Amino acid sequence: MLAKRIIPCLDVKDGQVVKGVQFRNHEIIGDIVPLAQRYAQEGADELVFYDITASSDGRVVDKSWVARVAEVIDIPFCVAGGIKSVEDASQILTFGADKISINSPALADPTLITRLADRYGVQCIVVGIDTWYDTESDSYQVYQFTGDEKRTKATTWQTEDWVKEVQLRGAGEIVLNMMNQDGVRNGYDLRQLQQMRAICHVPLIASGGAGTPDHFLEAFRDADVDGALAASVFHKQIINIGELKKYLSEQGVEIRVC
């Protein structure tokens, strides 16, 4: 069995790490490189960086900090933000990223997933899915341009259908960003994770809602996700990564303990 992964998420805006609640009202957390170093030292298995306004601004992630991060950490990291072509991806990987993640650009052009997977291999290609639970219809809907409150919009995709589609097109991993839970710290949406796990045959990463060590345990034990991504509990030092991994190991979760 592959070890489960703990993945701090760093949302980047204007060159700094920020964090919002339900993808809104972002506050500045700090500088990118020191935070990346801290998480690597605490025992994170990998890091994810989202340039949250790149797609809505029509630009590609700023590559200067990608190179600086690559110089100071020795764990894998993934970068997302406005990657719309093989050339965009090539530059980010050349600057030191281990994976690239696409979200809104994949919704605009689903063939991008296949082109990237064919060029770099599926192991390099992550698809992020921003999913919102609509109580009236009791359904999960995919959203686009979520880094910009003014441009955020629902797509025509139901989350389950998009999860199936991106796998067919070559996604090597899926990060499910559960918008209702984002930053609230009330736990991951286990029902949604279980539904998507049943149809997901590539690594599935839970994102949105972590507030306690038990929330991570539930995601691994009850939804069988491959990794758990979190931001605010790590940024605000509510949970220490090393202590979290020790707890999970004691509960029987297969995990790399520092």
From Swiss-Prot:
Pathway membership, UniProt: Amino-acid biosynthesis; L-histidine biosynthesis; L-histidine from 5-phospho-alpha-D-ribose 1-diphosphate: step 5/9
A GO biological process held by the record: L-histidine biosynthetic process
A molecular function (GO) term: lyase activity
Signal peptide interval: none
HAMAP family, sorted: HisF
Name recorded for this polypeptide: Imidazole glycerol phosphate synthase subunit HisF
Keywords for the protein's UniProt record, in alphabetical order: Amino-acid biosynthesis, Cytoplasm, Histidine biosynthesis, Lyase
Gene designation per UniProt: hisF
The reaction(s) this protein catalyses: 5-[(5-phospho-1-deoxy-D-ribulos-1-ylimino)methylamino]-1-(5-phospho-beta-D-ribosyl)imidazole-4-carboxamide + L-glutamine = D-erythro-1-(imidazol-4-yl)glycerol 3-phosphate + 5-amino-1-(5-phospho-beta-D-ribosyl)imidazole-4-carboxamide + L-glutamate + H(+)
Family affiliation: Belongs to the HisA/HisF family.
